[in-house]
Amino acid sequence: MKKIEDKLLGSYYTPYRTIQFMKEYLAREHKIYGKVLEPSVGDGRFLDAFEKEESIEKIVAVELIEEKVGQLKNRGYLEQVEIVADDFLDFAEKTSEKYQLIIGNPPYINIKNMENNSKEKAKEICEKFQLPNSLMQNMWVAFVLAAVSCLEREGTIFFVLPMEFLQVQYTYRR
């Protein structure tokens, strides 16, 4: 049952070695990432890997599922970690904060499996970026676009994305 629920929610947890690779890659960049956003925190794997990094002043971790939020809050993360119970698409719309690093593994939910309100939010994001609605075939697309709106001018987005991201259809439009 849990696997079916995770699939419907687009939850595919990032392997620890992938997170370690991402962490090492960022370390080679020698940047200071003061404010970090994790827009789909899930089970907290990225938080576990990054919470003690000296170059990070604050991590905001957004999670839609209340049960996971409660579990994360009970873990006792350092005080610079803020866990927010919200839909990231709503969070991105409301926040005025900008982040130097946005990192994570967005949900992979095919448009056919999205709830109607999620479809509407995703399409609104496409419109905001003056992109055709036909681009919105999966929730990860909306997450990437919403993340762009939360990013500082010289910031970095580092997401685990599917191969389809490299298809001309996605890369050619903008």
Question: Where do the protein language model's features map onto the residues?
Answer:
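Conserved Class I SAM-dependent methyltransferase catalytic core
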Residues: 43-45, 64-68, 132-174
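Short, conserved active-site loop motifs that form the nucleotide-linked donor/cofactor pocket
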Residues: 81
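Acidic, glycine- and histidine-enriched catalytic cores of nucleic acid- and nucleotide-handling enzymes
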Residues: 86, 101-104, 111-113
